[in-house]
Amino acid sequence: MTRSLVINTASHAVPIRREFRMAELTDRFGTMVFSEEVMKDYLPKDIWKRLAATLEGGEPLDLDVANAVAHAMKVWAISKGATHYAHWFQPLSGITSEKHDSFLEPNHDGTAITKFTGKNLIQGEPDASSFPNGGLRATFEARGYTAWDPTSPAFIKDDVLCIPTAFCSYTGEALDKKTPLLRSMSALSRESKRVLALFGKTPKKVVPSVGDEQEYFLIKKDAYRKRRDLVITGRTLFGAAPCKGQELEEHYFGAIRPTVSSYMKDLDDELWALGIPAKTKHNAVAPCQHELAPVYGEVNEAIDQNLVMMEKMKLIASRHDLVCLLHEKPFEGINGSGKHNNWSLGTESENLLDPGDTPLDNLQFIVFLTAVIEAVDNYQELLRASVASAGNDHRLGANEAPPAIMSIFLGDQLTEVVEKIIDGKASVHATRGVLDLGADTLPKLMQDNTDRNRTSPFAFTGNKFEFRACGSEQNVSDSNLVLDAAVAKSLKSFADALEGTPEDEFQDAALEYCKKVLTDHQRILFSGDGYSDEWPVEAEKRGLANNKTTADALPAFVSDKAIALFEETGVLTKAEAQCRYDCKLEKYNKLMNIEATTMVREARRTYRPVITAYPTKVAKGLETIRAAGAEAAMQCEQNTLNKLCNGITTINDSIKALDAVHQKAEALDGQEQANVYAHEVVPAMDTLRAAVDAMEEIVAADYWPVPTYDDILFYV
């Protein structure tokens, strides 16, 4: 019954119709954002100039300016239908938090006014002990503060004015994802400006930009509700492979189904109104998998927008009778979902990672390229730790995503450039070629300066680096703050070494410096197949780390090397870094506990009763066949019965084994607990899953208690 209900519901799904004219796009874009253009319209000129000094130059914000901004923000928000405001922040859980306060203020005579002051704008006071804090706040030390981040614009979401804020403790420690990210941006800007000054340039600031390609799955809500493992953990803990997966390679860039297209259009509409520049949408590799990519933006605002985007993706899916799955691996045997973090660095006038047509002649680019290579090699384990999570462990190294080994892919042209610098042959350069496709009706194409290597975790793609190891569900603040801090450290080393060099000697000295650094860190460059069995062996020879699980990776976050980096760049104190390690570890352990508990309970209560009862039906059929004297058919049924009985024994043994190692893990805590979960509980879960999945392929479809992969993946 379950299977037929799912199929019947899906086959009669009708896409939600909506009216939308592309001519409205430019007028609609950003209408729910208190942008700089809106500020100019609502603020007096002198107030706007003083606020602009804060936005552009980091000048302190005076209270009279805050009061004027708050009043303008309130008037604008109410005109858009907002009734409440909220300090919108990112605690260490990685998701967003908000508390809604009404603009209404009652009078003593029973009437009411609307009120929103500068103090309401710039500071809030949530309970710091109720959020993940790694021990920085005890229950009796509840006070924490949210502080307005004027560099990320306020926006209206569901009739609530959301004000992006930082979150810190009463004693000043950062308790959020945003604060250290902003610090890393400052460090990177500071050191980049020092380097650019050596080239005679004085930009106002240097800003890292990010474009995050978001992958996700869409499935029918009815099927989702019938899968308790999906509801509780975000992924299927059981499920045999579907009859057809992604092997035909027909879903990637394929025609988008009407139901999904309708969802995507509604999502675009809401994101555009929120000023989120959603640009590209398409089917991804796996069935029911899709991707949404925005235009690049300043990293702080881009991450804010990605968090809003993920929230909207889930909300709008529900309106369409769908469920949006952001877990990194909701289905076994087909691709999981990632979030490719496209990172670049620029000033108000140039992209510092643009090599130009002759990169070997572009010394400034070579310096910044060298800094990135040095940063990734020096802090490879820290970068790996920044993307570590229970969900992402299922992707990394699984021949669908980059391996857990950090390496850099530069492409043939830049690899040649690096080799020439190392060899001292700086007079020869590569230039971009022209691709002739061999047909008169097709245009000639300019060849990019890199090919694409989908197996590389950190690939140069023309004028940016694509960090492909990030998980789809993750807040990528950690990845970006680590990258920012590491590159800032490399640039600082360059500036310290080269400042004071006579102008006529600078180019030779800079190239010689790059030659030494590239020689020392050439091991991190790899252009081959990251999925191959040979690469881990080669990586070990090169001395590259291979931290396969979250439990293996997280200690790097509090290594002496990491703490020194964080403290030198001013991104995190030792206590703040320890806090983040503790929170990540605690989250991993809690998620693994939930998964193991759910798996044992589902195996006992949902799957085993059906699998145990089914042999009775087979045995009755066997007796009927025996009475009929059909020897061949009888042998077939006997084999099925034997498989079922053996399978039941295997399932029972697997449940006991998982229970035992789970109890062992529960008796521990911290890193020891994580080690047991990663290296003992997960293998035991895999064994139990394999035993149940084997029975799914034998038990009749009408008996199976939950929707199968075939039911879920092909009826949206």
What residue spans do the PLM features occupy?
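N-terminal hydrophobic targeting/anchoring segments and the immediately downstream early-domain regions
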Residues: T2-M22, T139-F155, V160
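Active-site core of metal-dependent hydrolases
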Residues: R28-E141
